[in-house]
Amino acid sequence: DGYYYPSSGQAASVAECLLMEAKRLGIVIHTDSPVTQVKNKNNEFIAVTSQGEHFESRVLIIAAGSLAGMKEGKLTDPQDFCRTLGLKVQPTVPALTALVQEKDTIGKIWSGVRVQAAVALISDGKCMSKDKGEVQLTDYGISGIPVFQVSRYASYSLLKKKKTEAVIDFMPSMTKNELLEELRVRAGFTDRSAQGQLCGLWNSKLVHALCKKARIAIDRPMRLADCDNLAALAKEYRITITKTNPISQSQVCAGGVDLREIDPSTMECVNVPGLYLTGEVLDVDGICGGYNLHWAWATGTIAGKAAANKIGKQRKNR
């Protein structure tokens, strides 16, 4: 599908490779010393840690990511450092995360089901994004990669207090008419209950949920009239989204420092010389598949080289 992951299937493999290379290069890493404060005094940056340490430099790279995936209240939001230094920051919201639906008894029925489906994110009646793949149905809403891909739009829609909905197509491989014809053929087996007639078409728990929503008795045969309702529902199953999972359960955040604040050729701040920003601190977020990691590494490489060059020039001019 064009996405890149370690063949080990473990994200930790990537981190281990980076740590081994850092060790080889003699890079000193301070652990258990989260930065709590950043100051810019007379063109000198000062980073203060929770251990009371003070690190001073004429060059500072903020590569602290975001609060995504972090336990709430454990770390200082990296965006606060940027605001303190006078940078414009766009509101940060959860992205690549699950969506929570309006309370509905259907969730208890379909919880745990994985299904190939298409998902469209609707904000005040307008389709903002859509994707398809394996959707995970939960007792609280929907999850899975297709849901993650559209979740940033849900976050911003909710932030602006717009009506936010997800429309699910539970049979993306068929048109509505093709599905309707399939259902009519199955309805012809009048000696079976609806559960039996629909056996093999969807997961049995999803069949139960769809029939309940369409007001079809699961223990009785479907009628031809039921087929129209079920086809329409299965192709456009609409749920109201009330919130996303919190930032602590999100893979990344959308939002961050306005890109107009930096020179993209060096990642240096236009109005704060010597300050460099990389990765998720900036107002850039991508879909699943390694894009956010690539952005972090690419901008980190650019910023690292530019910062090193700047330090080299400063030393020569002394």
Predicted regions and their residues:
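Short hydrophobic core segments
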Residues: 35-36, 54-71, 82-83, 135-140, ...
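A conserved FAD-binding loop/helix module that cradles the flavin
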Residues: 66-81, 85, 284-313
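An anion/pyrophosphate-binding glycine-rich loop and adjacent beta-alpha core
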Residues: 88-93, 98-221
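Feature captures the FAD/FMN-dependent oxidoreductase FAD-binding
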Residues: 1-59, 207, 211
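Glycine-rich loop(s) and the adjacent beta-strand/alpha-helix scaffold that form part
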Residues: 59-105
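A glycine-rich dinucleotide-binding beta-alpha-beta segment and adjacent secondary-structure elements
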Residues: 31, 207-285
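Short loop/edge segments at beta-strand edges and connector loops
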Residues: 29-33, 91-93, 245
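Flavin (FAD/FMN) cofactor-binding core of flavoprotein oxidoreductases
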Residues: 7-15, 23, 95-103, 244-261
